[in-house]
Curated annotation (Swiss-Prot):
GO terms for biological process: regulation of DNA repair. This is Regulatory protein RecX. The gene is recX. Belongs to the RecX family. It comes from Oceanobacillus iheyensis (strain DSM 14371 / CIP 107618 / JCM 11309 / KCTC 3954 / HTE831). One of its GO terms (cellular component) is cytoplasm.
Length: 272
């Protein structure tokens, strides 16, 4: 049995207290420290006698409280998923038993709620990014959110809203300068949008509804540029029909139409 000799406030942390225990010679020595919440909960005061088992319990309670306080600070920046909180506490080397207890308390107090987190996450991604539902789904999955909760949260991202975002992204891409054929640009845009997490069906639907027809003058200008490059590349080793075939195949792979390719061949290789 040990008796509390005195209790002092820590200089740097006013909500923490040092507990000094009485020594056999009538003096005192530092025993342990606790948070104010623990001090109040167990009504610790000068003269109180503590068994070794109780001191151990108080130290464990304080360790748990410090980890809990640390987690609240972590959550103060933004809402987190249960897995994010667990990963954070593991990095802080908190015992698994304490982690489970902290998360249980946080869920009870609504600090941690994966359904609410998923809904806020989806809305944030819709408003501040160009990501589609599949990519958002993957992000939430990596954060440990349950599949049913993800599905429910993604209801905030209906097809019509996806189409609006896809249309804006396509328009922006088509306005940028490019040395590629119109068809190749469309294919690249489709691929890019799928990588962002949009469904191919939604992308195709938007492209069909939009006026994405090629600018003939620009297409011809780009074809001539690409065609001249191919001629320069192949005419050192090929001539006649073989050269025409190489150039035609190269331009076709780049997405140009047969009519334009033939027009270029007729104009550029008429003497071959």
């Amino acid at each position: 049995m040990k008796k509390i000799a005195r209790i002092t406030t820590q200089k740097k942390h006013k909500n923490r207290y040092n507990i000094f225990l009485q020594t056999p010679d009538g003096g005192d020595a530092y025993g342990f420290s606790v948070d104010e919440a623990i001090l109040i909960e167990y009504r610790l005061s000068k003269g109180m006698e503590l068994e070794d088992e109780m001191i151990s319990i108080l130290e464990q309670k304080d360790t748990l409280h410090k980890a809990y306080t640390l987690t609240i600070h972590f959550l103060s920046y933004r809402m987190r998923s249960e897995k994010e909180v667990s990963d954070y506490l593991q990095k802080k080397e908190v015992d698994e038993e304490h982690i489970a207890e902290i998360i249980k308390r946080l869920k009870k107090e609504k600090w941690v709620d994966d359904q609410q987190f998923a809904e806020m996450f989806v809305r944030s991604r819709i408003n501040s990014s160009s990501k589609g539902p599949k990519m958002i789904q993957q992000e939430l999955f990596e954060k440990g959110v349950d599949g049913s909760k993800i599905t429910s949260a993604l209801e905030q991202y209906p097809v019509e809203e996806q189409k609006q975002k896809v249309e804006k992204l396509i328009s922006k891409k088509l306005q940028s300068k490019s040395k590629d054929s119109h068809q190749k640009r469309i294919d690249q845009i489709k691929q890019n949008l799928m990588q962002k997490g949009f469904d191919s069906g939604v992308i195709s639907m938007v492209i069909q509804q939009m006026d994405t027809t090629e600018d003939t003058d620009r297409e011809w200008e780009v074809l001539q540029l690409q065609g001249e490059k191919l001629l320069y590349k192949y005419q050192k080793k090929h001539s006649g029909f073989a050269l025409k075939q190489k150039v035609m195949e190269g331009l076709y792979r780049k997405g140009f139409s047969f009519d334009m390719i033939n027009q270029f061949i007729d104009q550029s290789l008429q003497d071959e």
